[in-house]
């Protein structure tokens, strides 16, 4: 049986909706299926039911959103110190995703519109900026990507276009646009795109101020056109439309020299009897000075005012001291010492790194000014020869590392177990 364009079958019989029973004259459209018909009103009703269920599931999902204290607790497991930064991040991320859930469940026109709060992380190299962003994304189970600001240029110049950032986050979630629109983007080395001078340049600054201008709309929220599956742009192809309004952008940078700008501002006083006289003897460390950063300092450093305005949440990280670096070596879930012990266990060998060795590793990293990032390099260099020999020797049961080994004054102490050699010979 076939239906003509007026809703009657080929025999001229009047047709009815199989669900609500309305005739073809009572509805706008009647859709035919195998021996059944459905009207446009029933289709719309089904859509409403599904939409309500999706909103309900979104609201129940909001209950699963970890609270700020829970977020900080997870950050504590991976990041040592930086208490203030972790609190700021926990609240900012919680509010961001709470805003997203509110958009999904409430669509009233007269409701208060919640603005997006992107984050700026300021801290020395190896202080934990990238690790904080990675841990947040893993906790929230959202797509996460890292972009290097130093490779970005204005559109039309050699280098990466800012829209490549959206390309990267799409790749992380197999080009699922809806999922990508709720992700986190960490832009590293953001201080490297600062304007080269305080005054706007006459010549074009394609990797500095030009990139800041290009990032403005992307960070605030725009619909970016991205080629599907990472292809090149050409006029005949269809683009994926990605709305960046709900993507959380976290920008991080060391901002070397920013502390001098902050100190010069804080040392300035008034004139006359009402002047606020301030001492020039500022014994605070870099981290303590950076904690006093204000928007005008960032603008003097070289960020344009519009860009600073798009990053309302600012968290500063402290420089890691020896005690913090020792804790980083041993305490986090994925601590380096735990990782190397596990590698040695897989060779049926115990690794002991003594306390004086941990202190020596921390001091070396501080001398190199690489922060926590340099700890792995030092350990890898120290244990390289041992890890080279270990798989070929079945007698080594324990390796001991002390301060002299770290300083290059002696080799790691290897303890041999002759019973292991006998067991190996018996097995042969």
Curated annotation (Swiss-Prot):
<dbReference type="GO" id="GO:0009376">
    <property type="term" value="C:HslUV protease complex"/>
</dbReference>
<dbReference type="InterPro" id="IPR003959">
    <property type="entry name" value="ATPase_AAA_core"/>
</dbReference>
<dbReference type="InterPro" id="IPR038366">
    <property type="entry name" value="Znf_CppX_C4_sf"/>
</dbReference>
<dbReference type="GO" id="GO:0016887">
    <property type="term" value="F:ATP hydrolysis activity"/>
</dbReference>
<comment type="similarity">
    <text>Belongs to the ClpX chaperone family.</text>
</comment>
<feature type="binding site">
    <location>
        <position position="17"/>
    </location>
    <ligand>
        <name>Zn(2+)</name>
    </ligand>
</feature>
<feature type="binding site">
    <location>
        <position position="39"/>
    </location>
    <ligand>
        <name>Zn(2+)</name>
    </ligand>
</feature>
<keyword id="KW-0067">ATP-binding</keyword>
<dbReference type="GO" id="GO:0051301">
    <property type="term" value="P:cell division"/>
</dbReference>
<dbReference type="GO" id="GO:0051603">
    <property type="term" value="P:proteolysis involved in protein catabolic process"/>
</dbReference>
<keyword id="KW-0862">Zinc</keyword>
<feature type="binding site">
    <location>
        <position position="20"/>
    </location>
    <ligand>
        <name>Zn(2+)</name>
    </ligand>
</feature>
<dbReference type="InterPro" id="IPR010603">
    <property type="entry name" value="Znf_CppX_C4"/>
</dbReference>
<dbReference type="InterPro" id="IPR003593">
    <property type="entry name" value="AAA+_ATPase"/>
</dbReference>
<feature type="domain" description="ClpX-type ZB">
    <location>
        <begin position="4"/>
        <end position="58"/>
    </location>
</feature>
<dbReference type="InterPro" id="IPR019489">
    <property type="entry name" value="Clp_ATPase_C"/>
</dbReference>
<dbReference type="InterPro" id="IPR027417">
    <property type="entry name" value="P-loop_NTPase"/>
</dbReference>
<keyword id="KW-0547">Nucleotide-binding</keyword>
<comment type="subunit">
    <text>Component of the ClpX-ClpP complex. Forms a hexameric ring that, in the presence of ATP, binds to fourteen ClpP subunits assembled into a disk-like structure with a central cavity, resembling the structure of eukaryotic proteasomes.</text>
</comment>
<dbReference type="InterPro" id="IPR046425">
    <property type="entry name" value="ClpX_bact"/>
</dbReference>
<dbReference type="GO" id="GO:0140662">
    <property type="term" value="F:ATP-dependent protein folding chaperone"/>
</dbReference>
<keyword id="KW-0143">Chaperone</keyword>
<comment type="function">
    <text>ATP-dependent specificity component of the Clp protease. It directs the protease to specific substrates. Can perform chaperone functions in the absence of ClpP.</text>
</comment>
<dbReference type="GO" id="GO:0051082">
    <property type="term" value="F:unfolded protein binding"/>
</dbReference>
<protein>
    <recommendedName>
        <fullName>ATP-dependent Clp protease ATP-binding subunit ClpX 2</fullName>
    </recommendedName>
</protein>
<feature type="binding site">
    <location>
        <position position="42"/>
    </location>
    <ligand>
        <name>Zn(2+)</name>
    </ligand>
</feature>
<dbReference type="GO" id="GO:0008270">
    <property type="term" value="F:zinc ion binding"/>
</dbReference>
<dbReference type="Pfam" id="PF06689">
    <property type="entry name" value="zf-C4_ClpX"/>
</dbReference>
<dbReference type="InterPro" id="IPR004487">
    <property type="entry name" value="Clp_protease_ATP-bd_su_ClpX"/>
</dbReference>
<dbReference type="Pfam" id="PF07724">
    <property type="entry name" value="AAA_2"/>
</dbReference>
<dbReference type="GO" id="GO:0046983">
    <property type="term" value="F:protein dimerization activity"/>
</dbReference>
<dbReference type="GO" id="GO:0005524">
    <property type="term" value="F:ATP binding"/>
</dbReference>
<dbReference type="InterPro" id="IPR050052">
    <property type="entry name" value="ATP-dep_Clp_protease_ClpX"/>
</dbReference>
<dbReference type="Pfam" id="PF10431">
    <property type="entry name" value="ClpB_D2-small"/>
</dbReference>
<feature type="binding site">
    <location>
        <begin position="124"/>
        <end position="131"/>
    </location>
    <ligand>
        <name>ATP</name>
    </ligand>
</feature>
<keyword id="KW-0479">Metal-binding</keyword>
